């Protein structure tokens, strides 16, 4: 049997760590729901998927990093939704870490670029760009890793979209299409 490519899906926050909360919409819940859609699509396409949490539980950043680093996975995608002081802030951001290890930096940036392109193709959302970031889960992991911010809960128009499962499913489809595009090019 061919060994399946393994992918880590990391739903941000959880348990008593709510992330952003706007009205009845709680980031930790939306992160998990979107991550479940991503995991289901990946499994359907023949990948081995490991999630850092499958329920509404608290998992420390250190534990998330350890899960990823022990996993021997090909890559990790961390899923979050955004918040800003300004209600006008809108769009998707994808972060990678400028790793001193050149190959990991390049792989993570290539993954981020591929995912951004596919997500925009499907969702027609605004792009705030692929950026380098210093988040623990992308900095301290040893496999290529990105952190997706799937839109602003603090923006009314975007919140309206994020409330709809169909939008989260299309976001998930874009993330999966991007992962597959990245893996096909062999820039692992």
Predicted stretch roles:
Residues 7-21, 93:
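Short, surface-exposed beta-strand segments enriched in small/polar/acidic residues
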Residues 1-7:
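Non-catalytic propeptide/linker segments at domain boundaries
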């Amino acid at each position: 049997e061919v060994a399946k490519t393994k992918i880590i899906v990391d739903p941000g926050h959880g348990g008593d760590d709510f992330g952003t909360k706007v009205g009845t919409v709680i980031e930790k819940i939306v992160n998990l729901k979107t991550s479940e859609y991503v995991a289901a699509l990946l499994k359907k396409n023949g990948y081995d998927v490991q999630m850092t949490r499958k329920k509404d539980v608290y998992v420390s950043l250190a534990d998330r990093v350890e899960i990823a680093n022990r996993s021997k996975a090909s890559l990790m995608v961390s899923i979050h939704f955004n918040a800003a002081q300004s209600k006008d802030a809108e769009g998707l951001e994808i972060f990678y870490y400028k790793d001193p290890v050149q190959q990991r930096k390049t792989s993570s940036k290539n993954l981020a670029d591929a995912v951004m392109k596919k997500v925009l193709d499907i969702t027609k959302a605004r792009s705030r760009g692929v950026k380098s970031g210093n988040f623990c889960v992308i900095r301290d992991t040893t496999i290529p890793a990105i952190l997706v911010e799937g839109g602003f809960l603090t923006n009314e128009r975007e919140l309206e979209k994020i409330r709809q499962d169909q939008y989260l499913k299309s976001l998930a489809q874009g993330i999966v299409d991007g992962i597959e595009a990245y893996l096909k090019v062999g820039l692992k």
